[in-house]
């Protein structure tokens, strides 16, 4: 699944490629993805110009003259800009055709993605209203993490993957951040000390920013998911060797998600 760094890289690419383009038409081949594609989408976008491309958590936000297009890539989705016409494939569900002939194509084999439209404030939209602070901003801190963890009866990994707590931390980067912080993923969130929360907030920012700076683990240009296992200390390395102490890594499932950690280095 594309996580925050992958979505941010997609945002930057789209900002570069489609800002200022005018929509000529919208072609919807699959009217229902995870949620129904708004039937008014073509009428709402036709003739409108893309003013900006922003991000909230894992949601891409395309600001148009009349409102906002909200896109979530789901498990397997990606957006690709075609500069010349190409016949759609089986999983090419939505095309936004621009007046210069280019096409922004949404491809999603599993149909877990979402395309929504709103003319209201983004903060009021049901998909965005309950999202927590962005992890790369000052609003997310160790003090904040300590405060929200006091009353949560959940393990720490699931706490930081909760979009209501912090926006956009997915499975990959939760594993990596917890390893760097030296915290077991299955510890009760309420057991974390203030110092541990400070350390974890720092490592969450580190792994996300490093992934963005390195170009992430997801080939956004082609949309193919290409992970680089050597870049990870724990994710995808269940029963491998710890890069720090040389001990054996353990693999468990938390919240039905694969979780890998070092029982020596993480307490």
From Swiss-Prot:
Binding site for DNA: 91, 110, 152
Entry keyword Lyase: yes
InterPro entries per UniProt: DNA_glyclase/AP_lyase_DNA-bd, DNA_glyclase_Znf_dom_DNA_BS, Formamido-pyr_DNA_Glyclase, FPG_cat, MutM-like_N-ter, Ribosomal_uS13-like_H2TH, Znf_DNA_glyclase/AP_lyase, Znf_FPG/IleRS
Catalysed transformations (reactions): Hydrolysis of DNA containing ring-opened 7-methylguanine residues, releasing 2,6-diamino-4-hydroxy-5-(N-methyl)formamidopyrimidine; 2'-deoxyribonucleotide-(2'-deoxyribose 5'-phosphate)-2'-deoxyribonucleotide-DNA = a 3'-end 2'-deoxyribonucleotide-(2,3-dehydro-2,3-deoxyribose 5'-phosphate)-DNA + a 5'-end 5'-phospho-2'-deoxyribonucleoside-DNA + H(+)
Signal peptide annotation: none
EC number in record: 3.2.2.23, 4.2.99.18
Disulfide pattern: none
Cofactor: Zn(2+)
MF terms (GO), sorted A to Z: 8-oxo-7,8-dihydroguanine DNA N-glycosylase activity; class I DNA-(apurinic or apyrimidinic site) endonuclease activity; damaged DNA binding; zinc ion binding
Cofactor note: Binds 1 zinc ion per subunit.
Pfam families, per database record: Fapy_DNA_glyco (PF01149), H2TH (PF06831), zf-FPG_IleRS (PF06827)
Any single biological process term in GO: base-excision repair
Residue ranges covered by zinc fingers (FPG-type): 233-267
Active site per database record: 2 (schiff-base intermediate with dna), 3 (proton donor), 58 (proton donor), 257 (proton donor)
Subunit structure: Monomer.
Record function comment: Involved in base excision repair of DNA damaged by oxidation or by mutagenic agents. Acts as a DNA glycosylase that recognizes and removes damaged bases. Has a preference for oxidized purines, such as 7,8-dihydro-8-oxoguanine (8-oxoG). Has AP (apurinic/apyrimidinic) lyase activity and introduces nicks in the DNA strand. Cleaves the DNA backbone by beta-delta elimination to generate a single-strand break at the site of the removed base with both 3'- and 5'-phosphates.
Designated name of the protein: Formamidopyrimidine-DNA glycosylase
Organism listed in the record: Pelobacter propionicus (strain DSM 2379 / NBRC 103807 / OttBd1)
Originating gene: mutM
